[in-house]
Design a protein with these regions (language model features):
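Solvent-exposed, non-transmembrane regions of integral membrane proteins
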Residues: 1-739
């Protein structure tokens, strides 16, 4: 038994290390290389088989010697079934691609090695269409209609077509819309076996957590002894400073706030969405100076200024330049530049030559140093070019909606004279009213533009309530002040709870902590709900949104467990605050965009939600581990043991959630990509994380029985979560780059 257990540990550790190495090698050698030499190689399959056989034998022997619950046996059995399904797919599945032009017929496909294989039937392309979001040019879906023998088959994103056991997945299309590329997969047995394993895993995990015979119950009772006891916290020093400088070179036109707000309600096509100008203004101003306001002026006022009072605003030093090299090339002192600072005395763009040289020489360091400044310069140029002011809709042939900016050539549009004059002159009239401060006239013109939009684009222009909601969201979404406030308060509460020696102060601290948790939860829920309503989809499509959801999930978990587990109550707001801080830092002004077609699946939303809940629990175990090490340092042995039990208890739902989340993601991938597992870097690291966190759940690992070792392990294990969420996005490659 002992030798068999050691063999399992060695093989499992080897697999984890190989997976880590493979993801690193992939970033330099490419996906095809690691797929051929590692993931699909015979020796790697043998390694997994050895782990499966050894684990199966060990479970049988262990069952005969000790009272192992049926639910725990089923968990392990489900993984064996999943591995059997994967082995079946590896040995029996076929895959390839076909490319068809309209009305073209084929009976073959090309496999990954470029070899031709017979399908056993003929398939032809009837037509291919790109379906856009209403009123925009953003693709909502790609739809291919095939004919296999005499049967018509529809293939689109998240909708696989099938015939005779072959599955067709939308993979690409020709630029002239007359051709399509489809992935073809034939896996008659592997998918069914694997899905059986998924179902068995889900049932067994739920049974394990509710069963009274599992180790989880013992850990629950042991962790409960923490209730009412003083918990230890780690103190940290937080220093927050801000500085803003505004240099006025000439008298500006003061734009009335109400007039600017009316202007902000006009809709434009921006970032493939129909959105109020207020959203564009918020994005524009935040991008330039790092915050949605400037010198006491709202984003609407500043944006209107850049449109209607150009000479003044080009002299305002409101463009934040962080890189020293960019500051040096622009000839500015400090980090604030004006648009005029980007031009030399000959009206040449100062960064043009250095950037061209950097790209020519492959100087990535200089490219990185100048990229942010160049992007801000070009955002202003985009505004001047009308890219942010496409406000006049026109429904062309087949209902395709075009949007035009003021002054943009209208081509051969069939418009009467009055309408043409309105399109060409309305912005001039609005500019005159804004500059002269004629509030009534400006409001009237803004309403006329909005009314025109509803006449010409009534099917796609947002309602007044949706516009109000989006502008309200833009105002309430400012992150810096609330995040810093939450972070400061949660740190102070952690410190106070450590220093409070009498129960009276402890009770006050707990009360304040509960109030803070509820305030943060209500605030985060409001932001997520507003973003959901405005975007039209669950806000979990990018890093900013998923970090916000992780903060929300942490707060929910805190409120659920705070009455029984004091450390969770103390650390929940702190972990949530850090999640919000990361969201703020990584994307200070996240844009709301239309979803990529492949992301329009309820399965994906559930996958992300479940995974983020598991990350929240893993984060709590890391903080509890830190607290446990402090207890060890202070020779609080009983407290140290209790905290270790709490970490292990939280691992049960955390590991269950990440396992369920991974396999829901696999089902989504199977529906969207045709494969339930493709060894993408993100899914590989999620598997690594699950394997790492599964180890402490096995009582047979003696090293982890010691509380100190358990706490160290929990801290180090969280590095895998950080790598899965951040490292893969920034350092590795894969299909999850949009996450």
């Amino acid at each position: 038994m002992k030798h068999l257990k050691n063999l399992i540990l060695v093989v499992a550790t080897a697999i984890i290390l190989i997976l880590i190495t493979a993801t690193i090698v992939e970033s330099s050698k490419g996906t095809a290389f690691v797929r051929q030499h590692i993931y699909t190689s015979a020796w790697f399959v043998v390694l997994w088989a050895a782990l499966a056989v050894a684990a199966a034998v060990y479970i049988v022997l262990r069952k005969n010697k000790s009272n192992v619950s049926t639910s725990v046996l089923l968990v392990h059995a489900s993984f064996l079934v999943i591995l059997l399904g994967a082995f079946t797919s590896w040995t029996m599945a076929e895959s390839g691609t076909i490319h068809l032009r309209q009305n073209e017929t084929t009976s073959t496909m090309k496999d990954e090695e470029g070899k031709t294989k017979e399908l056993g039937f003929e398939v032809s392309l009837k037509n291919f269409n790109v379906v856009n979001y209403p009123g925009t040019d953003a693709p909502m879906d790609y739809v291919t209609t095939l004919t296999a023998n005499t049967q018509e088959i529809k293939v689109s994103m998240n909708n696989i077509g099938s015939f005779n056991g072959y599955r067709f997945i939308q993979s690409g299309y020709d630029s002239d819309m007359q051709g399509t590329t489809l992935g073809v997969y034939h896996d008659p047995w592997g998918i069914g076996i694997t899905y059986t394993g998924y179902a068995l895993l889900f049932i067994s995990l739920i049974t394990t957590m509710v069963s009274k015979k599992t180790r989880m119950r013992h850990l629950y009772r042991k962790a409960l002894s923490l209730q009412g006891a003083k918990a230890w916290a780690v103190t940290a020093l937080l220093a927050v400073s801000s500085f803003a400088t505004s240099a006025n070179a000439q008298e500006m036109v003061k734009i009335d706030g109400d007039i600017a707000d009316d202007f902000g309600k006009i809709c434009v096509l921006y970032n493939s969405r129909i959105t109020p100008i207020n959203t564009v203004a918020t994005s524009f101003v935040t991008k330039l100076c790092g915050k949605p306001t400037w010198d006491g002026l709202s984003s609407n006022q500043v944006f209107a200024g850049w449109i209607f009072d150009v000479p003044y605003w080009e002299t305002v030093k409101m463009i934040e330049i962080k890189e020293k090299k960019a500051q040096e090339l622009l000839g500015i002192n400090g980090k604030w530049a004006s648009f005029d600072d980007f031009w030399d005395s000959y009206n040449n763009y100062k960064l043009d030559a250095p950037l061209k040289k950097a790209y020519k020489d492959g100087d990535t360091k200089l490219q990185k140093q100048l990229r942010d400044a160049d992007e801000k310069f070009n955002i202003i140029r985009m505004l001047y070019g009308g890219e942010m002011l496409k406000m006049f809709p026109y429904a062309g042939k087949q209902g395709h909606m075009q949007w035009f900016a003021p002054g943009q050539p209208l081509g051969n549009l069939k418009l009467d004279e009055k309408e043409l004059v309105f399109i060409k002159k309305s912005m001039d009239y609005l500019a005159e009213s804004i500059i002269t401060g004629d509030k009534a006239r400006a409001e009237e013109i803004a309403k006329k533009i909005y009314s025109y939009q509803h006449v010409r684009g009534k099917a796609v222009v947002p309602t007044k309530f949706r516009i109000y909601t989006e502008t309200f969201y833009n105002k309430t979404n400012a992150q810096r002040l609330p995040v810093m406030l939450y972070l400061t308060l949660s740190l102070v509460l952690a410190i106070v709870s450590t220093l409070s020696l009498n129960n009276g102060k402890q009770k006050k601290t707990r009360l304040v902590s509960s109030v803070l948790t509820w305030v943060m939860l209500i605030h985060t829920t409001l932001l997520l709900a507003l973003r959901w309503y405005v975007s039209g989809h669950l806000p979990m499509s990018n890093g900013y949104e998923t970090m916000q959801f992780m903060a929300w999930a942490t707060l929910v978990a805190t409120l659920v467990m705070q009455k029984r587990f004091l450390p969770v109550k103390q650390f929940g707001p702190l972990l949530s605050s850090f999640a919000l801080l990361v969201a703020m830092i990584t994307d200070g002004n996240p844009q709301i965009t239309q979803l990529m077609p492949v992301l329009q699946s309820p399965l994906l939303s559930v996958h992300v939600m479940v995974i983020m809940f598991s990350y929240a629990l893993f984060g709590l175990t890391a903080l509890i581990g830190l607290q446990g090490l402090i207890a060890h340092h202070r020779k609080q042995e009983e407290k140290e043991q209790q905290l270790a039990a709490l970490s292990q208890f939280l691992l049960y739902p955390a590991v269950a959630l990440i396992a369920i989340g991974i396999f829901i993601g696999a089902i989504w991938a199977n529906v969207s990509w045709g494969r339930y597992w493709s060894w993408d870097s993100k899914e590989t690291w999620a598997l690594i994380t699950m394997l790492i966190y599964s180890a402490p759940l096995h009582a047979d690992i003696k090293w982890l029985r010691k509380a100190q070792h358990m706490h160290i392990y929990m801290l180090l294990a969280f590095l895998s979560v950080l790598m899965t969420y951040f490292g893969v996005n920034y350092f590795l490659s894969g299909m999850h780059s949009y996450a």
